[in-house]
């Protein structure tokens, strides 16, 4: 049976790490066949104490704790790959937790797809968004639509070859032989860039919606605004590095439409209609009243991510410094 390494960066995660690790300890996959590598960025809360207590409580031996001296997640990811003993490694987050069949479904998916696609380097699934307050609920609403420019792992219903995977499981040997690591210029969006780099080098990725994890969305307006601007900046930096995806341009299109209003109102009409149609679709699907506000929320979201995009495009990696 395949051995799997799970790489989890942490920094002041005492609120979320218990749910994360307990779900990892209770996988329907043999405990002796996976390890958990924690890379802690010098937490100042009780994160490390909680981890050690959980390890003792569950009698889980295959857990190792490292200090992430540079603190940022991107460095933890690269160190995790170097220290991974598994046939596969998984990049995960302490702000999330996997379903009980997460490991089993990853392995089964990889083995099945690998038979038809020998260049398969990794697989991933979808994310359920958990909202703890109204700010987090607003973030959930925004990411529920493709018009946010977000990745399909938020809403995919069927399996498909994708250009990125969330909390992906990768073939350790293929990645190490390719010498592809996470680009440390990216403090945000580093996983997206890593996946695009794999695609650029001819590898394949696959998303299976049966591989499920849950993620706590940003719990404050300030954190969400900062994250959104950072995501935009990351995409601007990706274009500077030679990557491109047409979906990235949708959030920024409204800026050009505002400039074109004197010439024609057609583009603005298309923009508004696209948002209204998707608002109606989501209202019918979810029956949640908050989706009525989606047009306004998307407009504000597009403003923020556009600002970040042009900041990243102009300033490059200095945006994150």
UniProtKB/Swiss-Prot annotation:
The chain crosses the membrane at residues 252-272, 290-310. InterPro entries: Glyco_trans_2-like, Nucleotide-diphossugar_trans. It is an enzyme of class 2 (transferase). It comes from the Archaea. It is a multi-pass membrane protein. Involved in the assembly of an N-linked disaccharide that decorates the S-layer glycoprotein and flagellins. AglC catalyzes the transfer of 2,3-diacetamido-2,3-dideoxy-alpha-D-glucuronic acid (Glc-2,3-diNAcA) from uridine 5'-diphospho 2,3-diacetamido-2,3-dideoxy-alpha-D-glucuronic acid (UDP-Glc-2,3-diNAcA) to the AglK product Dol-P-GlcNAc to yield Dol-P-GlcNAc-Glc-2,3-diNAcA. AglC is specific for the monophosphate-linked Dol-P-GlcNAc. This is Dolichyl N-acetyl-alpha-D-glucosaminyl phosphate 3-beta-D-2,3-diacetamido-2,3-dideoxy-beta-D-glucuronosyltransferase. It comes from Methanococcus voltae.
């Amino acid at each position: 049976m395949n051995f799997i390494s799970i790489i989890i960066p942490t920094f002041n995660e005492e609120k979320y790490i218990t749910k994360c690790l307990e779900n990892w300890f209770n996988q329907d996959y043999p405990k002796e066949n996976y390890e958990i590598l924690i890379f802690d960025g010098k937490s100042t809360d009780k994160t490390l104490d909680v981890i050690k207590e959980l390890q003792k409580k569950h009698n889980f031996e295959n857990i190792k704790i490292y200090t992430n001296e540079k603190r940022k997640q991107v460095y933890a990811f690269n160190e995790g790959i170097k220290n991974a003993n598994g046939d596969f490694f998984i990049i995960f987050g302490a702000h999330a937790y996997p379903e009980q069949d997460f490991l089993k479904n990853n392995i089964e998916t990889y083995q099945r797809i690998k038979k038809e696609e020998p260049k398969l380097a990794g697989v991933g699934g979808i994310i359920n968004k958990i909202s703890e307050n109204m700010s987090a609920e607003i973030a959930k609403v925004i990411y529920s639509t493709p018009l946010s420019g977000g990745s399909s792992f938020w809403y995919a219903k069927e399996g498909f070859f994708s250009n990125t995977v969330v909390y992906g499981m990768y073939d350790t040997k293929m990645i190490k032989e390719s010498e592809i690591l996470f680009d440390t210029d990216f403090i945000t969006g580093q996983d997206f860039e890593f996946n695009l780099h794999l695609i650029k080098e001819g590898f394949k990725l696959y998303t299976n919606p049966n591989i499920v994890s849950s993620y706590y969305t940003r719990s404050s307006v300030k954190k969400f605004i900062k994250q959104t601007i950072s995501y935009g900046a990351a995409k601007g930096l990706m274009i500077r590095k030679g990557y491109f995806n047409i979906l990235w341009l949708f959030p920024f299109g409204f800026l050009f439409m505002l400039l074109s209003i004197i010439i024609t109102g057609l583009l603005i009409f298309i923009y508004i209609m696209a948002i209204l149609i998707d608002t109606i679709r989501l209202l019918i699907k979810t029956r949640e009243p908050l989706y009525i506000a989606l047009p306004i929320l998307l407009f504000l979201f597009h403003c923020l991510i556009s600002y970040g995009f042009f900041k990243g495009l102009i300033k490059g990696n200095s945006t994150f410094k």
